[in-house]
Amino acid sequence: MKLGVNIDHVATLRNARGASYPDPLKAAKIAINAGADFLTVHLREDRRHIRDEDVFNLKQNISTELNLEIAATEEMLKIAKEVKPYSICIVPEKREELTTEGGLNIVNMHSKLSGIIEEMHSFDIKVSLFIDPNINQLKYLEKLERKPDIIEIHTGDYCDNPSEEKLKLITNSAEYINNLGIECHAGHGINYKHAKEIKKIPHISALNIGHSLISEAIFHGLHSVTKKMKMTISK
């Protein structure tokens, strides 16, 4: 199973003092050296953590794949075409939220998403969609004229209050996505304990993990916690 490390909150710490440190690029290189398979950053419309220059700097200077999380806006899609990351992950976004609160509403967006996927593919950029583990939403993937390359299952509800029922929803969703011939990832709120359970689910090929790793890194160092998480999901 692959590990994507989200380094947004390195930038959060930097921006808290309006400083030039800690440097997200330095964090990215440490995570890669410790075993991260790819890097993820979320360029939000309010630039609360990652900034435009961070994204360009990462793309130019890291040795692994860059996954850029963005809202489906003209501004963000334009930036994606300029940066040309390995992949983009389309996420819903509200200015007032502390973090992404849920998955995309495919029911209301399927026609728009088809156009985005086609456009990004013309720039050789893979497209991921961030979706709740809800079969009723996932069914609308079949209505898309152009299929995404990846679906990332939103694991926040499970991680906030784990239960077998919620884990089953993720399992069923991963199976459904796999049957559509789409690669399945998972992310949001995952720590070591959650990772041990989610890694058992068939068809999930990668986890995106950020806040818990950056939090643990305060006490144990980013190299150490990234290496530990990679070992956790690889066993």
Swiss-Prot record:
Keywords for the protein's UniProt record, in alphabetical order: Cytoplasm, Pyridoxine biosynthesis, Transferase
Record's catalysed reaction(s): 3-amino-2-oxopropyl phosphate + 1-deoxy-D-xylulose 5-phosphate = pyridoxine 5'-phosphate + phosphate + 2 H2O + H(+)
Gene Ontology process terms (BP): pyridoxine biosynthetic process
InterPro entries in the cross-refs: Aldolase_TIM, PyrdxlP_synth_PdxJ, Pyridoxine-5'_phos_synth
Function (record text): Catalyzes the complicated ring closure reaction between the two acyclic compounds 1-deoxy-D-xylulose-5-phosphate (DXP) and 3-amino-2-oxopropyl phosphate (1-amino-acetone-3-phosphate or AAP) to form pyridoxine 5'-phosphate (PNP) and inorganic phosphate.
Binding partners and assembly: Homooctamer; tetramer of dimers.
Name of this chain's protein: Pyridoxine 5'-phosphate synthase
